[in-house]
């Protein structure tokens, strides 16, 4: 089943995601983006156009930057209004989860597959503390 991807964020974060996806995976041109609030132009028509473009035999994924933020709320409202059960919304998106969904081997995305991708893509703390044993190596 074909997947259509939209990344909608406050400011130009979506454009940054698209650039990174192009560099890392050559997939930037396949992704639609909405950079909300960078001008006075209402982004709702772009959102509605994406939602309407997802056919019954396709799946759509909308990534948003902040759960409960205005972009996320608008996406949820428009998907519910369109009654499209084949469109998923993933909020608090990061580059890792977008890559995971794009390269998913699942022919049909399921809630479980998306939750697994989210869990694998969690933010990680990289430990930068030097252990005391390392200091002894210098003497």
Residue locations for each model-derived region?
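N-terminal loops that bind phosphate or other acidic moieties
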Residues: 2-64, 68-139
């Amino acid at each position: 089943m074909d997947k259509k991807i939209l990344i909608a964020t406050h400011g130009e974060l979506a454009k940054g995601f698209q650039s990174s996806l192009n560099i890392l995976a050559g997939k930037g041109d396949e992704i639609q983006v909405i950079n909300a609030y960078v001008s006075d132009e209402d982004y709702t028509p772009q959102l509605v156009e994406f939602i309407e473009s997802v056919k019954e035999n396709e799946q759509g994924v909308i990534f948003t930057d902040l759960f409960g933020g205005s972009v996320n709320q608008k996406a949820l409202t428009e998907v519910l209004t369109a009654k499209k059960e084949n469109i998923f919304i993933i909020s608090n998106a990061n580059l890792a989860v977008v890559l995971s969904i794009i390269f998913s081997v699942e022919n049909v995305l399921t809630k479980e597959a998306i939750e697994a991708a989210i869990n694998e893509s969690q933010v990680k703390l990289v430990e930068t503390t030097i252990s005391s044993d390392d200091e002894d190596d210098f003497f």
